[in-house]
Amino acid sequence: MIASKFGIGQQVRHTLLGYLGVIVDVDPEYSLAEPEEDEIAANDELRAAPWYHVVMEDDDGQPIHTYLAEAQLSSETRDEHPEQPSLDELAKTIRQQLQAPRLRN
C-alpha cells in the first residue's frame, strides 16, 4: 500500500508556481488517461506515486480543478490566507465534513 504525504482538506502549495490549493481527493497512483510523452505523468516513477485532485484559484479568483503529482506539492504552513479566503473556507468545510460525516438514508 502506498502512503500519501497529504490528506483531503489539507492546504498545499504548488512547488514550482507557488499557488495555494486545497486537496479534495487522493489517488494512490496516476489514474487518468495515458499521458502524452511530454507530460510530467509520462514519468513511470511519478505515475506510481500518489496524485492529488487540488482546487486552486485562477488569476480572477475562480476555482480551478488540477491534478498534480505528490512531487509537485509542498505543505502549506499558514492556516489563514487573507488574499484567498475562499480556499481557507473550502479547507475548513472539508475538514469539518470529514470529522462529522452525515448519515445518508
Curated annotation (Swiss-Prot):
SMART domains xrefs: YccV-like
Q: Name the keywords, alphabetized.
A: Cytoplasm, Stress response
Cellular component annotations (GO), alphabetically ordered: cytoplasm
Entry keyword annotation includes Cytoplasm: yes
Superkingdom of the organism of origin: Bacteria
- Show the disulfide pairing: none
GO MF terms here are:
DNA binding
Q: Name one GO biological process term.
A: response to heat
Q: State its location(s).
A: Cytoplasm
State the function annotated in the UniProt record.
Involved in the degradation of certain denaturated proteins, including DnaA, during heat shock stress.
According to its UniProt record, which protein family does this protein belong to?
Belongs to the HspQ family.
- The identity of this protein, by name, is Heat shock protein HspQ
Whose protein is this, by species? Klebsiella pneumoniae subsp. pneumoniae (strain ATCC 700721 / MGH 78578)
| Organism taxonomic ancestry | Bacteria, Pseudomonadati, Pseudomonadota, Gammaproteobacteria, Enterobacterales
Gene that encodes it: hspQ
